[in-house]
Amino acid sequence: RISGIGKAGNPDVQPNVDIVIGPGTEVVAGEGKIVTAGGIDTHIHFICPQQAEEGLCSGLTTFIGGGTGPVAGSNATTVTPGVWNMSRMLEAVDDLPINVGLFGKGCVSKPEALREQIEAGAVGLKLHEDWGATPAAINNCMNVADEMDIQVAI
């Protein structure tokens, strides 16, 4: 993690120290480089586990999206639909060397199905016009997200 930018050292023996460091501090020289704590892909179609390695190689540390693996639905959508699929996908991504958040499907007009997906582990809900983002569905999704303090992707 990046904890600071500036002149690091021991202020007892060096002048103008901005960041006090100790014997357990890892220092990375970043002159002339772009240094980031890690990128976040917020629109990932979970198709295969190899995506984690590809993401890490390009500086990503977090995937947020959805899918159920190598099926047509994952190509078309970035949600993991339903409690059963959410549970299976959470098991599948548990050992990946990357942070993962799964979206549940948000286009429903009754709140129970949304709550079930969140309780099963969804970090957020996704609304999409292809699934019937009617005013009632949008209102329902936003109300449940507010009630359960989660994000909505529209």
UniProtKB/Swiss-Prot annotation:
Native source species: Photobacterium damselae subsp. damselae (Listonella damsela)
Cofactor (UniProt): Ni cation
Enzyme's top EC category: hydrolase
Family membership noted in the UniProt record: Belongs to the metallo-dependent hydrolases superfamily. Urease alpha subunit family.
Primary location: cytoplasm
Molecular-function GO terms, alphabetical: nickel cation binding; urease activity
Record InterPro entries: Amidohydro-rel, Metal-dep_hydrolase_composite, Metal_Hydrolase, Urease_alpha_N_dom, Urease_alpha_subunit, Urease_asu_c, Urease_Ni-bd
Gene this protein is translated from: ureC
Amino-acid positions noted as binding Ni(2+) 1 in the UniProt annotation, renumbered to this chain: 126
Protein name (database record): Urease subunit alpha
